[in-house]
Amino acid sequence: MSTSLPLRDDGAVRASFALALFVLLGLGLGYSLVATGITSALMPDQAHGSLLRADGRVIGSSLVAQPFADARYFQPRPSAAKYDPTAAAGSNQARSNPELLARIATARAEIAQRDGIAPDAVPGELLTQSGSGLDPHLSPAGAQVQLRRVAAARGWPEQRVAALLQAATEQPQFGLLGQPRINVLALNLALDRAGDGVPGTENGVEQQR
């Protein structure tokens, strides 16, 4: 005959349920609300997606690249995700992949013709996709090769575009982290503002909203 005592929870079930509820509401909901409130107060732009506005309208985010069809604009790096934030990804193609090599060769020829430079002068960043496919930045060299084309398309002296390019160049964070870089969307907005005082209405920025 069994002499074991009957099972008793002594409130263990209620305690477990209360703990689970506290973790769910206190940490899952409460922590998120507090963190969101703090970041919104201290860094409102970053907390809301680092959005860029023109003429009172959101035209993009400084964190996400977007394409520009008009010759008056600087072009970002190519994107395997077609610049879709919901499909961020690289091509995952090996360096020896024939499709990758063919695509790079085609892009090199197209960019050289578009920007009026020698094929060997095309920077690698304009030929290759970033890991996310959404890199919003170019190096100064990647923008510099496009300067002549942008200036000619706008009918501006090259020095005018060069000054805006220089002003848009971001230095390494704290002088140590990263490399000098240029946010392509921010630079293109600066071009519009300098052009006619109506930012975001040029063909390209407006079309990519």
Swiss-Prot record:
The keyword Transmembrane helix applies. Keywords: ATP-binding, Cell inner membrane, Cell membrane, Ion transport, Membrane, Nucleotide-binding, Potassium, Potassium transport, Transmembrane, Transmembrane helix, Transport. One of its GO terms (cellular component) is plasma membrane. It holds the Pfam family KdpC. GO terms for biological process: potassium ion transmembrane transport. It is a single-pass membrane protein. One of its GO terms (molecular function) is P-type potassium transmembrane transporter activity. NCBIfam families: kdpC, PRK00315.1. The chain crosses the membrane at residues 18-38. The system is composed of three essential subunits: KdpA, KdpB and KdpC. It comes from the Bacteria. Its main location: membrane. This is Potassium-transporting ATPase KdpC subunit. Belongs to the KdpC family. Part of the high-affinity ATP-driven potassium transport (or Kdp) system, which catalyzes the hydrolysis of ATP coupled with the electrogenic transport of potassium into the cytoplasm. This subunit acts as a catalytic chaperone that increases the ATP-binding affinity of the ATP-hydrolyzing subunit KdpB by the formation of a transient KdpB/KdpC/ATP ternary complex. It is found in: Cell inner membrane.
